[in-house]
């Protein structure tokens, strides 16, 4: 992903998800988020129709299903379908509500990861309405939460939120803020093209 190789990243994500035995995921709660890597790889590369075509995980895996609906909400917002985006967000919330409050994915609490997901979805809806300030505020909130996550490799969130906030700041004409954000990202993720471009 960091090198911008979308086909390779998507293939690897699909392969990883396919190799996860359902029995293992049932026995080890907190790892079903891996099932959503393919759809979030498509989000990462802006493949909105691909996001909507991606099959949902098995319903018993509530976290993976929730974040997959968030991915679909983002895609619908990017395609200008705000009503559909709202429906997808509602489905995400229904699935998040199925998870115990103390749930973890990897090393991090689902409450933190769900906050990032909700913020991304709300930001895309705000962007679609032309409300740059609200979109930037939501993404800034997500960056703050992401910065507080415990380290894991790969990260327990699918990609750096700064890579969404930076381009939005540029679109809004806030070039100095975008530059500062990208410089901060390069300290966390050296030499990544998402921040260098």
Q: Across the structure, where does each feature detected by a protein language model lie?
A:
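Solenoid-like repeat scaffolds
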Residues: 16-28, 54-63, 93-110, 143-152, ...
